[in-house]
Design a protein with these regions (language model features):
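Cleavable N-terminal signal peptides of Sec/SRP-targeted secreted and luminal proteins
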Residues: 2-18
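Intrinsically disordered, flexible peripheral segments
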Residues: 19-376
């Protein structure tokens, strides 16, 4: 039943975005989303942002979908709302319908991209720059014990509050990986500023057959992107897995409070760590879970000339990571480039300034861990 409702809502959204209508000075007119900034316009329509072309016409798809798919009851009073599991960010990921619905939302963007012309060899090629090889350390995943302080979520009496010795910790097993480095050997015939894009994706399907590149392109995840200055001749670019635009495990409130108080007493220096963002992709999830015998994946590295983005940052880096600001760009190339469009001819995709490298991800058995995992 819920799957049917999800498809119905998604179908209505598809009809709405097929012929975008914008309102200006009370006059409605159609908008061609296949022109410049059309992808952003499509995102505004689906997300129902304040700057959407016509909020009253398109409505709030995701908000309504969460209410309908979550079987939320209509509140009898504005202050007596009973939100469903899907309407809580903390619990939405536990409902299978969440993934079905957002897979459909993602499909709209992929469908949009499928109507754009494929990249030509000339567009992808960077004359004079060649990636000779990519060397990657051994990749290992494992589950470790992650402990976090939940004291603030519990009620304590005045005596316990004054003593400040009442602590409750929760322990959870989370996927992690052994930090690794990779080296990119690049030959350049000139001094030039470039942008490296590093992707990781599967190679074989569940039957052990190699996945065609055009079908497999949506499975590649960009986990690193950085600007680098190439010198004339051979360049060895070394990069660590901790250097990407990812988020490390957060410092607990108690630990942060203790550091601040110690700094105020002159017992230690308090350093503002700007690398600790409140939102972003967790660094511990860079690698998918491997197998004990090893699971084959593919590294893909692409080099393009560096061109400064026209979007200037509009957020304060001290208090925000800039997620959702629309200004976190290294250059003007689209997200996921060059996998964002259909690959019509594979021979035009394999340019000298790109490189596929097979890697094997191993998973460390639980019995080899420092702390064995109890069975629940």
């Amino acid at each position: 039943m819920r799957t049917t409702i999800a498809l119905l809502l998604a179908g209505l959204c598809a009809l709405a975005i097929a012929t975008p209508v914008q309102v200006k000075d009370g006059v409605q007119y159609r908008v061609n989303i296949y022109e410049k900034d059309g992808f952003d316009l499509l995102g505004k329509v689906i997300e129902s942002n304040p700057d959407s072309p016509n909020n009253r016409f398109y409505g709030y798809l995701q908000v309504i979908a969460h209410q309908v798919l979550g079987y939320s009851a209509h509140p009898v009073h504005q202050y007596k709302v009973q939100p469903s599991v899907l309407e809580h960010f903390e619990t939405a990921l536990r409902d299978p319908i969440f993934y079905q619905f957002y897979k459909r939302i993602t499909y709209y963007f992929l469908k949009y991209k499928s109507h754009l012309p494929h990249y030509t060899y000339k567009q992808l090629n960077y004359p004079g720059v060649t990636i000779d090889s990519v060397n990657v350390d051994k990749l290992v995943t494992f589950f470790d014990k992650f402990e976090f302080d939940i004291t603030n979520a519990l009620y304590v009496n005045e005596e316990e509050y004054v003593k400040d010795d009442f602590q409750v910790w929760a322990r959870q097993y989370r996927l992690n990986y052994k930090p690794f480095t990779y080296k990119i050997n690049v030959n350049s015939d000139k001094n030039t500023d470039v942008v490296f894009r590093v992707f990781l994706g599967p190679k074989y399907d569940e039957q052990g057959h190699e996945i065609p590149l055009n079908e497999n392109r949506i499975n590649f995840v960009e986990f690193d992107k950085f600007v680098y200055t190439l010198k004339t001749g051979m360049n060895v670019v070394e990069r660590n897995s901790r250097e990407g635009e990812t988020v490390k495990d957060r410092t607990t409130y108690r630990a942060l409070y203790q550091h601040v108080m110690s700094a105020l007493k002159g017992q230690e220096e308090f350093h503002l760590d700007m690398t600790e963002a409140h939102n972003g992709f967790p660094n511990r999830f860079i690698l998918p879970m491997g197998k004990v015998s090893g699971q084959v994946y593919q590294f893909y590295v692409y080099v393009s000339p560096y061109q400064t983005s026209h979007e200037k940052p509009t957020f304060d880096k001290i208090i925000s990571a800039g997620v959702g600001s629309g200004t976190r760009y290294v250059d003007d190339l689209p997200f996921g480039y060059p996998f964002d469009r259909q690959i019509k001819y594979e021979h035009t995709f394999f340019v000298p300034n790109s490189h596929f490298e097979d890697v094997v991800i191993f998973h460390k058995p639980q019995v080899d861990l420092k702390y064995p995992v109890e069975q629940h």
